[in-house]
Every structure is written in structure tokens, then in C-alpha cells.
Curated annotation (Swiss-Prot):
GO molecular function: ATP binding; ATP-dependent protein folding chaperone; isomerase activity; unfolded protein binding
Protein name (record): Chaperonin GroEL
Purpose: Together with its co-chaperonin GroES, plays an essential role in assisting protein folding. The GroEL-GroES system forms a nano-cage that allows encapsulation of the non-native substrate proteins and provides a physical environment optimized to promote and accelerate protein folding.
Classification via HAMAP family: CH60
GO CC list: cytoplasm
Pfam family, one: Cpn60_TCP1
Record's signal peptide: none
Keywords, comma-separated and alphabetical: ATP-binding, Chaperone, Cytoplasm, Isomerase, Nucleotide-binding
Subunit structure: Forms a cylinder of 14 subunits composed of two heptameric rings stacked back-to-back. Interacts with the co-chaperonin GroES.
Species name: Psychrobacter cryohalolentis (strain ATCC BAA-1226 / DSM 17306 / VKM B-2378 / K5)
Catalytic activity of the protein: ATP + H2O + a folded polypeptide = ADP + phosphate + an unfolded polypeptide
Predominant localisation class: cytoplasm
EC numbers: 5.6.1.7
InterPro entries: Chaperonin_Cpn60_CS, Cpn60/GroEL, Cpn60/GroEL/TCP-1, GroEL-like_apical_dom_sf, GROEL-like_equatorial_sf, TCP-1-like_intermed_sf
């Protein structure tokens, strides 16, 4: 296929045009008074959003060179969102500003490689300064404030996230779901819950709720199907002597074994309940091991030389309470050794760090939370489906931002942290004038988020930026109320991780784009096909045939 190739200034100009289209669409959403963006959908009602990354993901441009520029800046937003969960709009504004200043310098004849080196040097100094500015986000109040700001000043969402973290721990799993009412609610599932219910409804001993509830039961964990009752008779007799109920978690319980257990249950003999093990394949084995660690039991597996016929009570787990429903099983207060549980959690945490798949990471984090003791579900309420989608996006953002705040602490929000980090660049010098120009490019760009927040709130950006720069520490501008003051005291915080990631990612992609000299894209199919017909142009001479008449 034939290619279209552009060089130098022409290539960079078209790329910059694409950057401006995307960045100008995204930047209007920044800050507490950011504007809405309406996105048309091929089906259903248009989406209304103030979420920068949602806007960026929708933009595809017709001109392929411009589109390349737009997609590279979209990469900045997506990467920042993946790492920190927020700060996408800030990163986009920073990238656009670095590029605009940088392109002017390149056009003036400066060396793009030295400009990039200067920018990189400045980023390292600014990131160190951001770390020095950060304070730990230990208490619920700080967590609630971060959540509220990320959810576009919705204090209810911030408070719900803080409550959820209090209930399930800062490393616990918190999920966001669509609710069925107008109100936002928080539900916490205590203990370990997995999505498998009883194999037969005849195991239910609470007819009003159709659940099987056991106090202090034994828990048998098996990684194969049980179909022959004779395999488990010796163990059932041992359990019977203890007068305790038995929960069986196996790959499956079927045929004669299932029938015998059900009949025994209905006659009031040994109280039992059989449940299929959660997950599939290797994940099933891992989850059985998790349950074994939580309950202090051992998985009966032929792979390690254990068989059901020789199983003893010591190999069974126990828990304070077990509730088995049609679709879920909850094990509360397992009798496992707390040191073993902590080691298991640490082991899973290492797997999360090594995993490259988002799906695997999510599943590993769920397992970790279940071991740690609970899952919190924030149910988002709204009047319409459009509002529901927009709100759910905001809650997801807020949740990611609060996690980032817990990891690396918080810094003053509203663009102030970046303005203060500029101080680290005032004495910084490069190896030559072009590198110094790169340092100055970043210094000017670091004002851009504050300028945009002020512009979106309808005030004069230059006046506010000069006032903020004249102050020190946490002194900044509250765009929501139009007041100056201590940003931390006013509850305007950003996670340090968000500010750091936005700056690093924006500078990284902008540096690559500044040093771009050639752009290559496919020619449209029509152009390519017509190129071979160029010889037909000679037929224009047929106009002379008019003289033959």
C-alpha cells in the first residue's frame, strides 16, 4: 500500500493541529467550574460528561496526521488514568502547553534533542519537589476531601468512599455498581464471599430466606468431584460424633453422594451443605487454598497425596458462621492463623505487582480483599440513565484518586502544587542554552493547569496566577468560592501521585513529539488506486478533435 510521508515543520504543524483539537475539547472540563461536554452516541441518548479521559477517548480526526497528534496526547490521558486514576485533564493541559512552547523553540532553530533533555531534567527536579510538598493522607477527613474533589466537588461521594475504606481497610476491595434508587448507598459484605450457592435447594434450613445458615461448622475443601458416598463416609462419621454441621466445597457433588447428603439433611441427621468451588482451572485451586488459609483447613488434593477416605477432622477448616444462598456463600470469621493469612495476602500482592493483565490484577485484588476481611460496594443512584453513567464515571475517578492519595500522600490542589514545584527549577541549569530553554518551557507549562481552572471559572487567569505565585506553601485560589487561602484547610487536595504522574507522562509524550521529524501514514484507498491512471491524462488532447467536424 502506498504511503503519505511528511517531513519537518509540515509534519509537526499537522500533528500540533490534532493535539490542539483534542486538548481544547478536554481542557474545558478542568476544575470545579469546568464545563460539560456532550458526546453523540450512535444509539441511545447523548452522553454528558465532565470526565477528561471520556472526552479524549471519543475523539478521532479525519486527517490522519492530525489524528496521530490527537492519539498521542490521548495516550497521556490514558496512561495517567491507568497509573493514578485521575489527573487526565491536567496531564492533557500540561502536554499541550509543553508542545506549544516547544514547537516555537524548534521553529526558532533550537535543537529538539537538547530541548527534550532540558525538559527531562526539569521534570526530575519538579517531581522531587512534589514529594517534599506531600503530606500523608491517613485520616478519613483527608480521604473524603480527595474523593469529593475528584468527583467534581460531590461531598457525599467523598464521604461514602472514606466510610468504605474505614470498613474494609485501605487495601480492601471497593466496587462501584449502578443502584436501583435515587440515593447513593454503601453496602459492606463482611467475611469472605464467593459467587457459588448450594448445589441443591434441599440444603436450605431457613425457609423464609431460602438460605443454609450454620454456626461453627466444619469446612471440607476438595479439588475434585465427589460422586461416590463411600469416599466420605469415614469423615462424615467423625463429624457426626462432634455434633457439628459440615460445609463441603468441592469441584462438584453429584449422583449418589448428593442424594445421600440431601436425604440425611431432610431426615434431621447430620446437617450438611454442598457448594461448588469458585472459579475455574488454576484460579479455582488458588481460591480453595485461600479458603483453606482463612479457615485453618487443608485442601484435600490427590496431587499432594491426600485422599477423602483417609481425611481427618484436623484437615477440616472451621468458621464462626457460614451463610449459603442460592447464588452466594459467605464465610465469616474463619479460624485460620492470622500470620498465615497475612503471608497469603503478601504473596497475592506480589502477584499483582508482577501481573501484566488488568483482568488478572482485578481478580487477584478481589482475592486479597476477601482474605483481608470484606468487600464494600458503592451503589450509585440517579434519576436517568444518562446521569447514572456520568455519575458512575465520577465515582470511579474519585475511588482511584483516594487510593493514589493513600499511597503517596496529598499536595495542595487547584494547580498550586505544580506552581510551588516551579521553585525547584529557578536555580536549575542545563549543559547549554537549548537545554535551559527546555527547562523554561516546563516552568511556563506548569502554570497552565492553574490558568485553565481560573479561565473555566470565568476569572482573569493572569491576575490569579500572579497572586498565587506571590504566596508560599499551601496558599492558593479556590475556584469554587472565588477565595484565596490555605488549600489544605479549605479541603482542596490532590493526590501527590496524580500531580507526579500527570507531569511525567505529559513531558514524556511531549518530548517524543518535539523530536519527531517524519510522519508516515497510509494513503486513502481511492488516492492509491487512481495513481496508476496518471497516464490517462494525455487524453486531454482529444479536445483538438473538434477541428475534424
Amino acid at each position: 500500500m502506498a504511503k503519505d510521508v511528511k517531513f519537518g515543520i509540515d509534519a509537526r504543524k499537522q500533528m500540533m493541529d490534532g493535539v490542539n483539537v483534542l486538548a481544547n475539547a478536554v481542557r474545558v472540563t478542568l476544575g470545579p467550574k469546568g464545563r460539560n461536554v456532550v458526546i453523540d452516541k450512535s444509539f441511545g441518548a447523548p452522553t454528558i460528561t465532565k470526565d477528561g479521559v471520556s472526552v479524549a477517548k471519543e475523539i478521532e480526526l479525519e486527517n490522519k496526521f492530525e489524528n496521530m497528534g490527537a492519539q498521542l496526547v490521548r495516550e497521556v490521558a490514558s496512561r495517567t488514568n491507568d497509573v493514578a486514576g485521575d489527573g487526565t485533564t491536567t496531564a492533557t493541559v500540561l502536554a499541550q502547553s509543553i508542545l506549544q512552547e516547544g514547537m516555537k523553540s524548534v521553529a526558532a532553530g533550537m535543537n529538539p534533542m537538547d530541548l527534550k533533555r532540558g525538559i527531562d531534567k526539569a521534570v526530575r527536579a519538579a517531581v522531587e519537589q512534589i514529594h517534599l510538598l506531600s503530606t500523608p493522607a491517613d485520616d478519613s477527613k483527608a480521604i473524603a476531601q480527595v474523593g469529593s474533589i475528584s468527583a467534581n466537588s460531590d461531598t457525599k461521594i467523598g464521604e461514602l468512599i472514606a466510610q468504605a475504606m474505614e470498613k474494609v481497610g485501605k487495601q480492601g476491595v471497593i466496587t462501584v455498581e449502578e443502584g436501583s434508587s435515587f440515593e447513593d448507598t454503601l453496602e459492606v459484605v463482611e467475611g469472605m464471599q464467593f459467587d457459588r450457592g448450594y448445589i441443591s435447594p434441599y440444603f436450605a434450613n431457613k425457609q423464609d430466606s431460602l438460605t443454609a445458615e450454620f454456626e461453627n461448622p466444619y469446612i471440607l475443601l476438595v479439588d475434585k468431584k465427589i460422586s461416590n458416598i463411600r469416599e466420605i463416609v469415614p469423615l462424615l462419621e467423625q463429624v457426626m460424633q462432634q455434633s457439628k454441621p459440615l460445609l463441603i466445597i468441592a469441584e462438584d457433588v453429584e449422583n449418589e453422594a448428593l442424594a445421600t447428603l440431601v436425604v440425611n439433611n431432610m431426615r434431621g441427621g447430620l446437617k450438611t451443605c454442598a457448594v461448588k468451588a469458585p472459579g475455574f482451572g488454576d484460579r479455582r485451586k488458588a481460591m480453595l487454598e485461600d479458603i483453606a488459609t482463612l479457615t485453618g483447613g487443608t485442601v484435600i488434593s490427590e496431587e499432594i497425596g491426600l485422599s477423602l477416605e483417609t481425611a481427618t477432622l484436623e484437615q477440616l477448616g472451621t468458621a464462626k458462621k457460614v451463610t449459603v444462598g442460592k447464588e452466594n456463600t459467605v464465610i465469616v470469621d474463619g479460624a485460620g492463623n492470622s500470620a498465615d493469612i497475612e503471608n497469603r495476602v503478601e504473596s497475592i500482592k506480589r502477584q499483582v505487582e508482577e501481573s501484566t493483565s488488568d483482568y488478572d490484577k482485578e481478580k487477584l485484588q478481589e482475592r486479597m480483599a476477601k482474605l483481608a476481611g470484606g468487600v464494600a460496594v458503592i451503589k450509585v443512584g440517579a434519576a436517568t440513565e444518562t446521569e447514572m453513567k456520568e455519575k458512575k464515571d465520577r465515582v470511579d475517578d474519585a475511588l482511584h484518586a483516594t487510593r493514589a492519595a493513600v499511597e503517596e500522600g496529598v499536595v495542595p490542589g487547584g494547580g498550586v502544587a505544580l506552581v510551588r514545584a516551579m521553585n525547584a527549577l529557578s536555580e536549575l541549569r542545563g549543559d547549554n542554552d537549548d537545554q535551559n530553554a527546555g527547562i523554561n518551557i516546563l516552568r511556563r507549562a506548569m502554570e497552565a493547569p492553574l490558568r485553565q481552572i481560573v479561565t473555566n471559572s470565568g476569572e482573569e487567569a493572569s491576575v490569579v496566577v500572579n497572586e498565587v505565585k506571590s504566596g508560599t506553601g499551601n496558599y492558593g485560589y479556590n475556584a469554587a468560592s472565588g477565595e484565596y487561602g490555605d488549600m489544605l484547610e479549605m479541603g482542596i487536595l490532590d493526590p501527590a501521585k496524580v500531580a507526579r504522574s500527570a507531569l511525567e507522562n505529559a513531558a514524556s509524550v511531549a518530548g517524543l513529539m518535539l523530536t519527531t521529524e517524519v510522519m508516515i501514514t497510509d494513503l486513502p484507498q481511492g488516492d492509491d488506486g487512481m495513481a496508476g491512471m496518471g497516464g490517462a491524462g494525455g487524453m486531454g488532447g482529444m479536445g483538438g478533435m473538434g477541428g475534424m467536424m
